[in-house]
């Protein structure tokens, strides 16, 4: 019964709450035209956002099909089910568990024309520090990385490793899309940090 509630009832409540929260907030978007250009030309991208900002991200997606990398940990199963409620394909794996098979599945999904979604600092951090997964994915696919973030005027910030944030109703929110980042075969994660793109 507990597993049924966790994997069936909770994702429905969570996805409905996210949609309702989006309607209760005054949400704007900056830089969306950068993503729309790729969508119009049917060119897949890699969408990257920090782990602690993921709550509202399903509402930001502007494409037609996307696969998202989610860890194989217990909470990852819940998140995967929630993401499916928004139409995302969940691919399970992380740098610490199931990473290589997950990377192959992401590359395969990209070759089928899907956008790819990843948290560069997930699933365990350190917070807001890029791990090698997103760079490897960009090098293997040739897709640009498009940074995405969300800011809210009022929010609850938890004391978790990622400083997880949940926006509050009636707050002002803003999705911000960054410029596409094309990764070369020799590029390192420190290069991206020095450029200030994350």
Q: Where are these predicted regions, by residue range?
A:
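Short gly/pro/ser/thr-enriched loop/turn and capping motifs at secondary-structure boundaries
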Residues: 75-77, 99, 124-127, 152-156
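Membrane-anchoring hydrophobic helices of lipid-metabolizing enzymes
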Residues: 1-56, 62-63, 170-172, 194-197
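Membrane-interfacial amphipathic helices and adjacent loop/beta segments
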Residues: 8-30, 70-111
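Catalytic-site beta-strand/loop segments enriched in glycine and acidic/polar residues
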Residues: 105-137, 141
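A cross-family acyltransferase "interaction/gating" segment
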Residues: 129-189
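Generic beta-sheet signal
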Residues: 93, 119, 147-148
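Catalytic core of membrane glycerolipid acyltransferases/transacylases, capturing the structured
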Residues: 44-97, 141, 157
């Amino acid at each position: 019964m507990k597993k049924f509630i966790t994997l069936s009832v909770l994702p429905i409540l969570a996805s409905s709450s996210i949609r309702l929260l989006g309607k209760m907030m005054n949400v704007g978007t900056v830089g969306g035209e950068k993503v729309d250009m790729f969508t119009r030309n049917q060119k897949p991208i890699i969408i990257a956002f920090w782990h602690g900002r993921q709550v509202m991200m399903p509402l930001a997606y502007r494409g037609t099909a996307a696969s998202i990398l989610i860890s194989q940990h217990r909470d990852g199963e819940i998140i995967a089910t929630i993401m499916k409620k928004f139409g995302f394909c969940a691919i399970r794996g992380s740098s610490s568990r199931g990473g290589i098979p997950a990377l192959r599945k992401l590359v395969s999904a990209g070759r089928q024309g899907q956008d790819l979604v990843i948290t560069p600092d997930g699933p365990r951090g350190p917070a807001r520090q890029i791990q090698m997964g997103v760079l490897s994915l960009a090098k293997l696919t040739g897709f640009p990385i498009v940074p995405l973030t969300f800011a809210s005027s009022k929010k609850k910030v938890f004391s978790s490793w990622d400083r997880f944030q949940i926006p509050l109703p009636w707050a002002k929110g803003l999705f911000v899309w960054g410029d596409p980042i094309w990764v070369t075969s020799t590029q390192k994660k420190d290069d991206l940090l020095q450029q200030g793109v994350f």
